[in-house]
Amino acid sequence: MANHSSAKKAARQTVKRTLINKKRSSAIKTFIKKVVNEISLGNKENANLALSVAQSKIMQGVKKNIIKLNTASRKISRLSRQIQSMDKSK
């Protein structure tokens, strides 16, 4: 347990930031799942719209240090490739 007031404040801030980061991380995962769901349904237009929203949220996560840039780029690239391959598979 923290004894100094500054350590107590730091502990409070850590809890607060952790909750905010978890919320943002969960939101990113939700938007990725929406894209994957649209891909599985075969709706290319909806998948593209969902991807643009997800891409925005992912890059916001990078800006806020929720995920790393390379991880974000990899996720966006893989989702884009899946959408582009929808025409080829039919």
Swiss-Prot record:
The protein, known as: Small ribosomal subunit protein bS20
Function: Binds directly to 16S ribosomal RNA.
Organism superkingdom: Bacteria
UniProt record similarity statement: Belongs to the bacterial ribosomal protein bS20 family.
SUPFAM superfamilies: Ribosomal protein S20 (SSF46992)
GO biological process: translation
Annotated Gene Ontology cellular component terms: small ribosomal subunit
Pfam families associated with the record: Ribosomal_S20p
InterPro entries per the UniProt record, alphabetical: Ribosomal_bS20, Ribosomal_bS20_sf
MF terms in GO: small ribosomal subunit rRNA binding; structural constituent of ribosome
Keywords assigned: Ribonucleoprotein, Ribosomal protein, RNA-binding, rRNA-binding
Gene: rpsT
Originating species: Rickettsia canadensis (strain McKiel)
